[in-house]
Amino acid sequence: MKSLSRAGLGLIVLACATRAVTAQEISGLVADREASAELAKIVATVRQNGLPLEPILAKVQYAVMVRSPAPRIVAAAHAVAARLEDARSALAPQPTATDIVAGENALWSGVSRKSLEEVRKVSPNKPVAVPLGVLAQLVVSSVPEKKATKYVTDLIKRGATSDQLVALGNDVNAEVRLGTRAMDALEVRMNRLNAVLGVPGANGDAASVPTSLQSGDGKKKP
């Protein structure tokens, strides 16, 4: 499983996303003059490109907190800026700032650009920050990315609410931390959702759901 510090930083990103960020606020966190000047350039470029600055602030704050050297802080800020651009492109045509932030965090968590595009494909006209956050959480919890993407996109198509998606991610994460295998925890939670949403029908969606979930009894067939 990936480190908890990664998941923790994701929470910092979402918390910072509720307010505006200034260039001075970011560059001023680093005492090294050269690094501070480089951070100011990164911030200016990100702002000029119309991308949210909050993830960069979160990254720099975290790096300073753990006493990372200045060059690593600058490199990390560059990487965040690149992921923000990649996330916006993958979530085109009109992602919200929150979508972009969630997309950047997902990419950092090990989710591929292709998976971001798959989520956008099944939800072309709605915000996707919550599904992307849950997808990232499942991947961090050691659910294979392709399977996690399949489950999340299937749930979107079947009308799962944001609360249901969030509960799924939180429950799986909690079970994994207690020692349960990620896929076992996911199947149990999916089975419960099937009871609410209905078992996938014969329209092709069922192919993405394990047989144990289609049976409705929560037990794997031999």
Predicted regions span which residues?
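Bacterial N-terminal signal peptides that target proteins for export
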Residues: 1-9
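N-terminal signal peptide c-region/cleavage motif recognized by signal peptidases
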Residues: 17-20
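General marker for long, soluble alpha-helical cores
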Residues: 22-222
